[in-house]
Amino acid sequence: MVGRLYRVLSCTEYLEGKRHPAPALKLTLYNVIGERILEDQRVPIDTGYEGSIMLTSELYQAFQIAELPRTLWRNYRTLTGAITMRMARGIVEIDDMRFECFVESPLFGKGKLLIGRELLNRLTIVMDGKRKQSCIGRLEPGNNPKKFNP
């Protein structure tokens, strides 16, 4: 049997949902000139969203100073059709980690506040549905077994 041991660094309570609680992570978000735009905000996790962080149109305005050229904006396919997303650089802080990421907001429409797979794939996360918590973890040193190949 192959296993790994992780140390939990912090946990965030799930958000209340219409039918079911929603996994979330607590983050602080800065624009590239260092202005704090969100502080210790619980943001829903959406594994169906491929980008890093989606923002409402209102929040996105604080990031327009570092907006990427339109040729680099992304298009996503949804059930209702293609959506063009404006993109800018931002800085996210989750627990003791701080790194640059992309923030996006729909060119048309209001947008939502979401954490997507591009950011999630940079983290070790346990979504503990029974306890209704999303936890950030770190692999214990010297505890990285080789992949299991039967």
Annotated model-derived regions:
Residues 1-150:
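Pepsin/retropepsin-fold aspartyl endopeptidases
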